[in-house]
UniProtKB/Swiss-Prot annotation:
Subunit structure of this chain's protein: Interacts with PAQR4; the interaction regulates the stability and activity of CERS5 and is inhibited in presence of ceramides.
Protein name: Ceramide synthase 5
One Gene Ontology CC term in the entry: endoplasmic reticulum membrane
Post-translational modification: Phosphorylated at the C-terminus by CK2.
Reported regulation of activity: Inhibited by fumonisin B1.
Domain TLC: 139-340
Top-level EC class as recorded in UniProt: transferase
Listed GO MF terms: DNA binding; sphingosine N-acyltransferase activity
GO terms, biological process: ceramide biosynthetic process; oligodendrocyte development; sphingolipid biosynthetic process
Organism: Homo sapiens
Topological domain spans for side Cytoplasmic: 332-392
Protein role: Ceramide synthase that catalyzes the transfer of the acyl chain from acyl-CoA to a sphingoid base, with high selectivity toward palmitoyl-CoA (hexadecanoyl-CoA; C16:0-CoA). Can use other acyl donors, but with less efficiency. N-acylates sphinganine and sphingosine bases to form dihydroceramides and ceramides in de novo synthesis and salvage pathways, respectively. Plays a role in de novo ceramide synthesis and surfactant homeostasis in pulmonary epithelia.
Residue positions of motif Last loop motif: 299-309
Bilayer topology: Multi-pass membrane protein
Length: 392
């Protein structure tokens, strides 16, 4: 029975690590056991070290947000308070939780008769209640400051490492003598740190502020983790370092623009957004397809030829390019709105509520509906926070 149980597992294990899938023709795992010096060649078991490192990165993030990001936010005037709290009302709360967060005209009129409130005041209550669930600016600032710090540090490390790497200056070096390209210490740490960070993002996105592009980001993290893992196991790490560095250069600029927006430094935010947009378009729609995809699809075919995992890796790279196109469209929409409004006010991929609703709430708090009702209900007063940036 034990043998029977082991049989399917052995077949599954053999299929997962099939040399026909992972490696070019006439190359076996045994060929990649050496050399003895340095880190040798990439091995699948190296990936296991990523998970404790990802947990460590998440723990460092908690400390960073608590003891560095939060004091910085308070120092520049970001308040440690959430949005206005809607006045308690059991009937409206039950409707909000159980029935709808956006009552139609008929329901509003029914609630108006039931509570002896005018319709405008009930609309105000629902708007306040929806915004009550929004995260405070302080939380968003801390999250962005952590990502900005990591992306900036890893980009500086990556560009310093690549500057002395021959494939940075001649991309065809990514495929010369492939797959017999031993790992250096710098390359190993660069790869493992990036992979651990994206694993930490994969788990933390379920506890972070929820964005409208949650599903897109989930796919992005899956594709990124898949790309880094696959390229490491089959030793396409040279081209992998170029891809990671290319993405990090615009990521930290986006986070910097969001930080300026949260801090209400509008002119700085606009400037950083313009720089980010230019860098994003050049790197994601220019350098990535015409330099990276060109070498993975055509130059690698010419030098080493296609094999099973080659097809999968290029499929993931093309999926990533599709995401680049989607994000470029969203960035273009923001830029168009910025030209019309005269400033960058909100990312189309931002939190659940829209900017138009925020404006309605601000108007609501200034309208006569804030006065007490005839049955002696407490006065509705408060304010709405300013515009806020989104998560990439």
């Amino acid at each position: 029975m034990a043998t029977a149980a082991q049989g399917p597992l052995s077949l599954l294990w053999g299929w997962l690590w099939s040399e026909r899938f992972w490696l070019p023709e006439n190359v076996s795992w045994a060929d990649l056991e050496g050399p003895a010096d340095g880190y040798g060649y990439p091995r699948g078991r190296h990936i296991l070290s990523v998970f404790p490192l990802a947990a460590g990165i998440f723990f460092v993030r908690l400390l960073f947000e608590r003891f560095i990001a939060k004091p910085c936010a308070l120092c520049i005037g970001i308040e440690d308070s959430g949005p206005y709290q809607a006045q308690p009302n059991a009937i409206l709360e039950k409707v909000f939780i159980s029935i709808t967060k956006y009552p139609d005209k008929k329901r509003l009129e029914g609630l108006s008769k039931q509570l002896d409130w005018n319709v405008r005041k009930i609309q105000c209550w629902f708007r306040h209640r929806r915004n009550q669930d929004k995260p405070p600016t302080l939380t968003k600032f801390c999250e962005s400051m952590w990502r900005f710090t990591f992306y900036l540090c890893i980009f500086c490390y990556g560009i310093r490492f690549l500057w002395s790497s021959p494939w940075f200056w001649d991309i065809r070096q990514c495929w010369h003598n492939y797959p017999f390209q031993p790992l250096s210490s710098g390359l190993y740490h660069y790869y493992i740190m990036e992979l651990a960070f994206y694993w930490s993002l994969m788990f933390s996105q379920f506890t972070d502020i929820k964005r409208k592009d949650f599903l897109i980001m989930f796919v992005h993290h899956l594709v990124t983790i898949g790309l880094i893992s696959f390229s490491y196991i089959n030793n396409m790490v040279r081209v992998g370092t170029l891809i990671m560095c290319l993405h990090d250069v615009s990521d930290f600029l986006l986070e910097a623009a969001k930080l300026a927006n949260y801090a209400k430094y509008q002119r700085l935010c606009d400037t950083l957004f313009v720089i980010f947009s230019a860098v994003f378009m050049v790197t994601r729609l220019g350098i990535y397809p015409f330099w990276i995809l060109n070498t993975t699809l055509f130059e690698s075919w010419e030098i080493i030829g296609p094999y099973a995992s080659w097809w999968l890796l290029n499929g993931l790279l093309l999926t990533l390019q599709l995401l680049h196109v989607i994000w470029s469209y969203l960035i273009a929409r923001i830029a168009l709105k910025a030209l019309i409004r005269g400033k960058v006010s909100k990312d189309d991929r931002s939190d659940v509520e829209s900017s138009s609703e925020e404006e309605d709430v601000t108007t609501c708090t200034k309208s006569p509906c804030d006065s007490s009702s005839s049955n002696g209900a407490n006065r509705v007063n408060g304010h709405m926070g300013g515009s806020y940036w989104a998560e990439e």
